[in-house]
């Protein structure tokens, strides 16, 4: 018997194929997004519990060293309270089987939930730019949690440059986490009397 099946097919096929695999009592790893509706998502979760198998979604960035460094900083309050997060993820292949929310924004949300240890994020504002009916190529999202943390996410497929940047603002410093950097993915700017010193 297989220990795990990996599903990496067009998004529109995820629900039906995942349902078939889970009903066969196999552990399953699905390439994001899991499916296209909350209803289908809930049903797959229920199937996994019913068949006593595990259902995973592919969120690779939560395993990166730079993201886990920031998680440590937040946990230990090294620079005081975390006040805001800004995440920018731009330039990726335009897809017809899903939209930019499910393709890119889902990464930022998974990273932020992992870092702050909360899945109770609330959307306070969202701006979407369509390139065809019901398919979004660009989004800007404002989120908040129950600790008054301000969160901003901007994603777009079409961009002249590839951007994978998250900015974390603390009481005592600002951290830039840039996954595009090959060497120094983390840059820290410490607040000193209304100015910033890099260290």
Model-predicted segments: where are they?
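A short helix->loop->beta-strand "cap" motif at the edges of active sites that frequently abuts
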Residues: 24-26, 51-54, 148-149
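C-terminal helical cap and adjacent loop that interface with cofactors, partners, or active-site loops
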Residues: 195-199
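Contiguous beta-strand/loop segments that form the cofactor/metal-binding neighborhood of enzyme cores
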Residues: 106-184
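Hydrophobic residues in well-ordered beta-strands that form the structural core
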Residues: 30-31, 55-57, 177
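Mid-domain beta-loop-alpha active-site segment that forms a flexible
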Residues: 58-65, 91-122
């Amino acid at each position: 018997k297989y220990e795990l099946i990996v599903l990496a097919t067009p998004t529109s096929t995820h629900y039906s194929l995942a349902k078939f695999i889970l009903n066969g009592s196999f552990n399953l790893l699905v390439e994001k997004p899991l499916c296209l509706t909350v209803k289908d998502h809930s049903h797959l979760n229920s199937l996994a519990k019913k068949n006593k198998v595990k259902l995973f979604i592919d969120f690779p960035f939560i395993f990166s060293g730079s993201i886990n460094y920031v998680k440590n900083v937040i946990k230990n309050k090294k620079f005081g309270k975390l006040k805001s997060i800004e995440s920018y993820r731009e330039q990726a292949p335009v897809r017809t089987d899903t939209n930019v929310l499910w393709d890119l924004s889902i990464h930022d949300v998974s990273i932020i939930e992992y870092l702050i240890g909360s899945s109770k994020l609330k959307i306070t504002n969202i701006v979407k730019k369509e390139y065809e009916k019901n398919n979004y190529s660009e989004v800007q999202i404002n989120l908040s949690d129950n600790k008054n943390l301000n969160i901003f996410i901007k994603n777009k497929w079409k961009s002249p440059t590839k951007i994978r940047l998250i900015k974390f603002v603390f009481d005592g410093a600002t951290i830039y986490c840039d996954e595009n950097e090959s060497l120094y993915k983390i840059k820290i700017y410490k607040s000193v009397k209304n100015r910033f010193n890099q260290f």
